[in-house]
Structure formats: C-alpha cells, structure tokens
C-alpha cells in the first residue's frame, strides 16, 4: 500500500491540485465554508477551545480558520536566556548535526544543506558543523510559525520545486524530499550566529507567508529569487523570541539550521516523533548571551 501511495505522489499534478485547493480555501462560501470547517474539526479532533475564535461560523474562509490565532497566553514562551523555544506546534521528524553539508532525512536518506538553501553557497557554509531540526505540522496543528530566539532578518530566498506531500511516509521514501519541494528560506542574524528557518511547501499547501512580505507562494515559478534586508537602522526587521514570523495555509514542515556551537543540548524529551508545543523549551544554548 505504501508503494501505491508513493507512486501516486509522482503521478499527481501536484501544482495544479495545490492551486485549485488554494482557490477553494480562500473562497468565502458562507454555509458551505462553515460546513467544511466543522467537518475538518471533527475529522482531525481539533481543540477549538484554544482558538481565539472558537466558533466555526466566525471564519469567513477555510484559510482564515486554518491560520487561526490562539487565545493570548495559551502558549506561554519560555523566557530563560539560555533556552531556545519550539517555533511551532507539531512533531519532531529528525534532528542532529550537520556533517559535511549533509542533513539526515530518514533511514537511508540524506540531503544537502546547499540544495536546501537554494544553492546559496555562502549561506550553506555558515551552517557547516552546526545542527538542524525538522518539525512536521499535521493538519490538526496550529499553523503559525514563531521565532525560536530573537533574530534580525538578513536574507530571504524563494526556491521553486516539487510539491510532494510532507509526512513520515514520504520522508521515508522520497529522496531529498525537503530539498526538492518548493520552499522559502529566511536567514536571521542572532547573538548565537545565523539561524535559517526553511518553510517547506507540500501538496495542497495553498501558500507560504511571512510577516514582513506577506504571501511568497503562490505564484510558483522555476527561478530562485533572493531578497536582502538591512540588519541595522530603522528598516531592520527584528523579531523577538516567540514572535510570529510566518504561517502555512494548510500544513507542511519547518527545517531549522543552527550555527556551529549555538546549541549545547536539545531539551529533555526533544527527539524524533516527540510532540512539540510552540514556546516550550527546545534546546539549551552554549552561548549564555540573552536570546529573548
């Protein structure tokens, strides 16, 4: 059965399907939209008591529901200076060291940090010998992405690619999955060195957004685009630990890259398949400089 599912991944018109779903998710269809939201809540057992707007009727579109805000304080941020926090609700797929520019995906599969970052060689060099973490967001999860530590945006890269589904099954069977799919790479300068937040697209992910640039995808294309940002002065974009940096309209995966010697140890219980909650302790930092 797994082989059939993977074969379908290669056969499906993934970009066309994703654009169609995106249009439907953005539509405001009144009672039909509310019915779809209620079905989704029941199907995926979503706890709406955490949402700022708990009633399905409050959402004009499915996208509004999917990117719903949480009630203030429902995800308290660990403010300890030596702690990096989880950026999302989800589940850890993999984490560990970046060795010789290679990142572990699943048993028998690695991919290149250079390819992941859109063949930006200077960026890839900055993370050699560092660490990575891959976190999967399931359909039921809260889909806003937050900063694990304070950082100032220096660069954003849009990398075109495939739109394979992103889940444990495809991670095991699709070589180089995260470096093949469409993605947005945001690089921040922090007191611990560079931080890369890679937002990976997937089948029926309607769009990827950032708080500073809005919707990055769609439109899709075949060309890599880069944007440079000032890191000092009035136009610098600095986000605090726990502050929102982006969101998915429908689910996917975040890959984080950390500089060498930024992380001392991952926090207790942070391991593959562990459930994550935004704001909780993710890693202990080697550098004791303030990260909040």
From Swiss-Prot:
InterPro entries in the cross-refs: PS_Dcarbxylase (IPR003817), PSD-B (IPR033177), PSD_type1_pro (IPR033178)
Enzyme class at the top of the EC tree: lyase
Record's GO cellular component terms: plasma membrane
Topology in membrane: Peripheral membrane protein
Any GO MF annotation of the entry: phosphatidylserine decarboxylase activity
Site residues by UniProt (Cleavage (non-hydrolytic)): 251-252
Residues modified as Pyruvic acid (Ser): 252
Residues forming the catalytic site: 89, 146, 252
Keywords: Cell membrane, Decarboxylase, Lipid biosynthesis, Lipid metabolism, Lyase, Membrane, Phospholipid biosynthesis, Phospholipid metabolism, Pyruvate, Zymogen
Main location: membrane
Chemical reaction(s) catalysed: a 1,2-diacyl-sn-glycero-3-phospho-L-serine + H(+) = a 1,2-diacyl-sn-glycero-3-phosphoethanolamine + CO2
Signal sequence extent: none
Record's subcellular location: Cell membrane
UniProt GO BP: phosphatidylethanolamine biosynthetic process
Cofactor(s) for this UniProt protein: pyruvate
Description of post-translational modifications: Is synthesized initially as an inactive proenzyme. Formation of the active enzyme involves a self-maturation process in which the active site pyruvoyl group is generated from an internal serine residue via an autocatalytic post-translational modification. Two non-identical subunits are generated from the proenzyme in this reaction, and the pyruvate is formed at the N-terminus of the alpha chain, which is derived from the carboxyl end of the proenzyme.
EC number: 4.1.1.65
CC cofactor note: Binds 1 pyruvoyl group covalently per subunit.
Pfam families recorded: PS_Dcarbxylase
Pathway in which the depicted protein is active: Phospholipid metabolism; phosphatidylethanolamine biosynthesis; phosphatidylethanolamine from CDP-diacylglycerol: step 2/2
Family recorded in the similarity comment: Belongs to the phosphatidylserine decarboxylase family. PSD-B subfamily. Prokaryotic type I sub-subfamily.
Protein role: Catalyzes the formation of phosphatidylethanolamine (PtdEtn) from phosphatidylserine (PtdSer).
Assembly and oligomerization: Heterodimer of a large membrane-associated beta subunit and a small pyruvoyl-containing alpha subunit.
NCBIfam families according to UniProt: PS_decarb
Protein name per the record: Phosphatidylserine decarboxylase proenzyme
Organism taxonomic ancestry: Bacteria, Pseudomonadati, Pseudomonadota, Gammaproteobacteria, Alteromonadales
């Amino acid at each position: 059965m797994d082989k059939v599912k993977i074969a379908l991944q290669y056969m499906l018109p993934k970009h066309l399907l994703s654009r169609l779903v995106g249009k439907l998710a953005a539509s405001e269809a009144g009672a039909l939209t509310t019915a779809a939201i209620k079905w989704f809540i029941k199907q995926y057992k979503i706890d709406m008591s955490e949402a700022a707007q708990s009633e399905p009727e409050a959402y004009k579109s499915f996208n509004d529901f999917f990117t719903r805000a949480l009630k203030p304080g429902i995800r308290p941020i660990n403010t300890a200076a030596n702690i990096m926090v989880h950026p999302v609700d989800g589940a850890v797929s993999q984490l560990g060291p970046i060795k010789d520019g290679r990142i572990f995906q699943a048993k028998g599969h690695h991919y290149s940090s250079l390819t992941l970052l859109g063949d930006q060689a200077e960026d890839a060099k900055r993370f050699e010998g560092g660490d990575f973490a891959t976190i999967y967001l399931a359909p039921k999860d809260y889909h806003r992405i937050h900063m694990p530590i304070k950082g100032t945006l220096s660069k954003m890269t849009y990398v075109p690619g495939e739109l394979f589904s992103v889940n444990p099954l495809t991670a095991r069977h699709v070589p180089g999955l995260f470096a093949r799919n469409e993605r947005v790479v945001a690089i921040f300068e922090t007191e611990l060195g560079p931080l890369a937040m890679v937002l990976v697209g997937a089948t029926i992910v309607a769009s990827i957004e950032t708080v500073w640039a809005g919707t990055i995808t769609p439109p899709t294309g075949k060309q890599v685009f880069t944007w440079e940002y000032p890191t000092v002065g009035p136009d610098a974009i600095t986000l605090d630990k726990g502050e929102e940096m982006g969101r998915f309209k429908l689910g996917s995966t975040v890959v984080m890259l950390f500089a060498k010697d930024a992380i001392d140890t991952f926090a207790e219980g942070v391991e593959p398949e562990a459930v994550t909650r935004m704001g909780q302790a993710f890693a202990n930092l080697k550098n004791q400089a303030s990260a909040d």
